[in-house]
Amino acid sequence: LLPNVKGFVNPDDSLLAVLISHPHQDHFGLVQFLPPHIPVIIGEAAHNILRSATFFTPSGADFEKTIYLSDRKTINIGPFEITPYLVDHSAYDAYSILISANRKRLFYSGDFRAHGRKAKLFQKMIKNPPKDIDVLLMEGTTIGRGNPEDKFQTEEELIPEFVDYFDSTQG
């Protein structure tokens, strides 16, 4: 069931680190099988969320070696230069990632949106995107919302409803 990635199942020095864009299960689910000496690159808040979740659920995660991402601050791992871009997403502390090596540049969009609580981050990316990209690797969980006449509530519109509901509930 584990992916056939060098260094993931059998020890191999070619696996330098594992990069997690945000704390959703489909992005970190197999990290529990990672050899403990392999660093995990992740946002600090995302790591704290996953570490805290281990108290409540086996789907949380903690790592022995961690390298933290910070918006537009480049880190170097072996021949790779990694620049994270904080994005708006339902998972807190989510990033798009620019990876440069050997004069080539790959931009991974990660999961993102332009309509959430941090929608300004999308506009920031549009105004100042990474330049000279050779490869774009793009997530595509929602390309459309079906019928254009359908209206979906925003998070901002839902918050007062949740507050009213919680206020009216005992316990």
Stretches found by the model and what they are:
Residues 1-19, 25-171:
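His/Asp/Glu-rich metal-coordinating catalytic cores
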